[in-house]
Amino acid sequence: MPRSLKKGPFIDLHLLKKVEKAVESGDKKPIKTWSRRSMIIPTMIGLTIAVHNGRQHVPVFVTDEMIGHKLGEFAPTRTYRGHAADKKAKKK
């Protein structure tokens, strides 16, 4: 079930302060955050946000198509290495 429209988008206060500071100063340095649950808002467009995936910070460049999505959607937490090859099929 999606979030109610009357509540508005959720964004952590500390991240919002960092974004506003970067926008007013024109700083292009990546903003480090652990807040994967924060929603992308229009003021973030053009900024690079380094989102933590549990091991490292993944740089995410925010575009206008990303508005309304959560930051965690763009920093995958699991790595898929593929299934093991079938040894019987390899010999034939």
Curated annotation (Swiss-Prot):
| One GO cellular component term noted in the UniProt record for this chain | cytoplasm
- A Pfam match: Ribosomal_S19
Taxonomic superkingdom: Bacteria
MF term (GO), any: structural constituent of ribosome
Q: Does the keyword Electron transport apply?
A: no
Cite the entry's keywords alphabetically. Answer: Ribonucleoprotein, Ribosomal protein, RNA-binding, rRNA-binding
Q: Which InterPro entries match?
A: Ribosomal_uS19, Ribosomal_uS19_bac-type, Ribosomal_uS19_CS, Ribosomal_uS19_SF
The biological process GO terms on file are:
ribosomal small subunit assembly; translation
Give the function comment from the record. Protein S19 forms a complex with S13 that binds strongly to the 16S ribosomal RNA.
Please state which protein family the record places this protein in: Belongs to the universal ribosomal protein uS19 family.
Q: PANTHER family per the record?
A: RIBOSOMAL PROTEIN S19P FAMILY MEMBER, SMALL RIBOSOMAL SUBUNIT PROTEIN US19M
Under what name is this protein listed? Small ribosomal subunit protein uS19
Give the source species: Vibrio cholerae serotype O1 (strain ATCC 39315 / El Tor Inaba N16961)
Q: What is the lineage of its organism?
A: Bacteria, Pseudomonadati, Pseudomonadota, Gammaproteobacteria, Vibrionales
